[in-house]
Structure formats: structure tokens, C-alpha cells
Amino acid sequence: MVEELNRFPLLRRGGAYNVNKKSPQASMQAIKYTVDALGDRNNIIYNFPQGIIKPPNFRPIEFQTGLTYIAEKAAKRYGKVYLMPVAVNYMFLRDNRPEVLVEFGDLIELNDDKPDRKKYTEFLAKTLEALCDKQFYDISQGHFKGYDTLFQRKLKWYRRIEQRLKKIEVKGSGV
């Protein structure tokens, strides 16, 4: 994750931090920081549980156990914790700039019951993989009804003309 933070400085500006898996002390410090941050209801933690940023369609999705460990610690301290899988995809659909498509999965509640860490990690990975596959299928079929446009830049002049021409009804010649 350190390499990703260096390659994408926007992540660091957004509050991203890395977990140094080579140093057990640094890993535990990052986990403690995350659990403490979850104590504030205004905080949301976005996690890349694969341990590295991978392309959206990379399969199989495999998680490291850190997410489950963090969720266990937070649930033990605060009574429960909520997890939500988020599928993010970027594609060149209608213009020469990519569109970012984000889909939120169902909320998963983890109580202070201690689940089997390995099985729960696999469950979370399969849940995210199913959401990503559904999103990819919807995109490939042109189903965009569930998506809202959050930001749209002004169309180029030729795209505006193209949209106007599509609105004009042309009657057939009857031939």
C-alpha cells in the first residue's frame, strides 16, 4: 500500500494511511489507530482489504485478515460495527474521459460475537466479489438506472450537437 500512496497522492490527501505488514509493531499501531477512529461516529474507514490496490475486474478477490481483525476489535470495544462492501469501477462509456461507477452493497453488522476470522474474511471477500460481478454485468448490459450522476462536466460542442440531432424526429420517406 505504500507504493500506491506514493503513486496516488490524492489518497494521502484524503486521509489514507498505510499498514506496513513487514513491521508487526507498525501494523499493530495502524490497527489500533483504525479501531480508535471507528469510535467516532462521524468517521468512515475505507479499506482495501486485499492489501494492495488491484484492477476492478481482478479475480478472485482475496482479502487479508486485517479487516476482520479490525472489525472484531472495534465490535468488542463498541458493541458492534457495520461493514459495507463498495464496488468501484471506472470505464470509458460515453466520452473520452472515464466515468467512475460506485455501487454500495448491503450493510453487514458484526456484533461482539467472535467469528472464525478466516471464514469471516472469506465471507466478506465473496460478498464483495458478488457485488463487483453484479456491477460489471449491469454495466456490460447498459443498465444504469440505479446510478446517479454526482458530477458532470460540460459537453464538448460536437457532443451537444449530437444530442440535439438525436432529439429531432425524422419521418421516413415512405419508400
Segments (PLM) and residue ranges:
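Non-catalytic C-terminal accessory region of glycerolipid acyltransferases
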Residues: 24-175
